[in-house]
Regions:
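Thiamine diphosphate
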Residues: 1-99, 105, 112-122, 179, 189, ...
Length: 269
């Protein structure tokens, strides 16, 4: 757990088990910039299974009313809360989030990804005044968090939805491309080691911070190409990332298969 600072100018609401009331408070704070001319940065943390699934209509209303703020789906995923029973195992909150056009959603794994996403959200909502809100899922497992890779454009890649985090090229024969998000990225990293050690198979591992944002980019590029048939077709971000990949592509998340399946049209393998 990271420390936090309470400020007299800020406010912490502990509302208990009342999702509708908590979401209403978040919407009130998220629309204060318009209704009361007071700029606020509301952050609502909840079990990810008890967010969009419980208050989906309120989430849509937040989009309609152009609320700004962060929704944090904590302890997310289906494999990391098995001890608490099926009722806590979220496998579809990101699917519901994808139905709201001005909801920007991410499923990061490491702290530096979360920091980059949060900073961009603050800039877009409170500096650029974009009428969007963020849904970010966070995890409950205890694992090491590496430093941000020292690569040019890494922050932009995180925000676009995916970046290569690991590459093994020891065998030069067979290779596979592994895509993982959230808690499953760590399983992909472990899988790459097993493939290399036990089966002599090389691999590229990509951290997918948002299948939803990758799909949005794909739809935007598809529309542009449709409306501009005389121009050279543009490539989606997924196509740019994976056009030189070798072997089969395996994409996974801790959510329903439809989550990673969103980028299937933009892969060629």
């Amino acid at each position: 757990l990271f420390s936090y600072r309470e400020d007299k100018k800020g406010q912490v609401l502990e509302e208990g088990i009342t999702e509708a009331g908590s979401m209403s408070s978040w919407i009130a704070a998220g629309t204060a910039y318009s209704n009361h001319d007071i700029e606020m940065i509301p952050i609502y943390l909840f079990y990810s299974m008890f967010g969009f699934q419980r208050v989906g209509d309120f989430a849509w209303a937040a989009g309609d009313s152009q609320a700004r703020g962060f929704l944090i789906g904590a302890t997310s995923g289906r494999t990391t809360l098995a001890g608490e029973g099926l009722q806590h195992q979220d496998g579809h909150s990101h699917i519901i989030a994808s139905t709201i056009p001005n909801c920007v959603s991410y499923d990061p794994t490491f702290a530096y990804e979360l920091a980059v996403i949060f900073r961009d959200g603050l800039k877009r909502m409170h500096e650029n005044k974009e009428n969007i809100f963020y849904y970010i899922t966070t995890l409950n497992e205890n694992y090491p968090h590496p430093e941000i890779p020292n690569e040019k454009g890494i922050e932009d890649s995180i925000l676009k939805g995916m970046y290569k985090i690991k590459s093994i090229n020891n065998n030069k024969k067979t290779k596979i491309t592994l895509l993982g998000s959230g808690s499953i990225l760590r399983e992909m990293l472990e899988a790459s080691e097993i493939l290399n050690k036990d089966y002599k198979i090389d691999s590229d591992v990509w951290s997918v911070t948002s299948y939803n944002e990758l799909r949005k980019d794909g739809l935007e590029i598809e529309r542009y190409n449709l409306l501009n048939p005389d121009e050279k077709p543009k490539e989606t971000y997924v196509e740019k990332c994976l056009k030189d990949s070798e072997g089969p592509i395996l994409a996974a998340s801790d959510y329903m298969r439809i989550s990673s399946d969103q980028i299937r049209p933009y892969t060629s393998k």
